[in-house]
Amino acid sequence: MRDVVLYVEDHPVNVLLMQTVFELRPELDLVVAVDGLSAMAATSKLRPSLLLLDLRLPDCHGTELLERMRCIPGWQDIPAIAVTAEAEFMPAGTSFCDVWHKPLRVPTLLTRLDRVIAPKARPDDPAPVRRQSMFSRTTFAV
C-alpha cells in the first residue's frame, strides 16, 4: 500500500513546489486540499501517513484544523507538520510534531520528508515508471 500525504495549502506556488518534491518521491502520493473545509471533506476518504498543514488558511488556522482532525477516530497518531511563514510559530502546546518554515527549499524538504516517512524498499515492487505529466500523481480534494 502506498503512503499518502495530505497537504493543506491555499497558495498555488507552494502547492507547485510540493508537487515538485513529490515527483522525486514516486512511492508517495500527494493529496492537496486548499482550505480547511476541503481537508475535512477528504478525511472521510483518506488515511494519510502524514499531514502537512499551512497555518494561515482562508477559512481557519492550521492548529484549529489539526484539532478537528485529531477528533476523527484513527487520526490521533498521524504525524502532522506545520508548514508556515510564521517565523515565531512553535509547535509547543499543539499536536504538531515539527514545523517547516517557508520559504521551502527542495533539498531540505526531501531530507525532512525522508525522516518522517522513511523510503520503503520492497524487493517485489517494480521500478517506478516516469509519467508523461509532471504532476500526474497529485490529487486535489474537493
Segments predicted by a language model, with ranges:
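The feature encodes the CheY-like receiver
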Residues: P58, Q76, E88
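Acidic, metal-coordinating helix/loop segments flanking the phosphotransfer/catalytic sites
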Residues: V32-L50
